[in-house]
């Protein structure tokens, strides 16, 4: 959660265009569902932790969205996979 706030309000996390784009995306996600932007960001961070234990992923290109229609809400994640990690079973 602190990482989210640092990225939203710091000037070194990326250029202004990318920061504005991320803020707008979070606002749109919130408007389209009853889930707060903070919950969506926490979900994104949890997904990164879990998936990273199995695969190498491009965290900067990862996208998580909530899409809804009249009947349901869908979690849509675009997670670029760079490679698989070997695990000892």
UniProtKB/Swiss-Prot annotation:
GO terms for biological process: cell division; regulation of division septum assembly. Signal peptide: none annotated. Pfam families: MinE (PF03776). Keywords: Cell cycle, Cell division. SUPFAM superfamilies: Cell division protein MinE topological specificity domain (SSF55229). InterPro entries: MinE, MinE_sf. It comes from the Bacteria. Prevents the cell division inhibition by proteins MinC and MinD at internal division sites while permitting inhibition at polar sites. This ensures cell division at the proper site by restricting the formation of a division septum at the midpoint of the long axis of the cell. HAMAP family: MinE. Belongs to the MinE family. This is Cell division topological specificity factor. The lineage of its organism: Bacteria, Bacillati, Bacillota, Clostridia, Eubacteriales. The gene is minE.
């Amino acid at each position: 959660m602190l990482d989210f706030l640092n990225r939203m309000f710091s000037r070194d996390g990326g250029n202004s265009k990318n920061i504005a784009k991320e803020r707008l995306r979070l606002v749109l996600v919130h408007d389209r569902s009853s889930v707060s932007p903070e919950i969506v960001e926490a979900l994104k961070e949890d997904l990164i932790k879990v998936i990273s234990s199995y695969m190498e992923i491009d965290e900067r290109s990862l996208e998580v969205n909530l899409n809804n229609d009249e009947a349901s809400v869908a979690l849509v994640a675009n997670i670029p996979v760079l490679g698989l990690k070997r695990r000892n079973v």
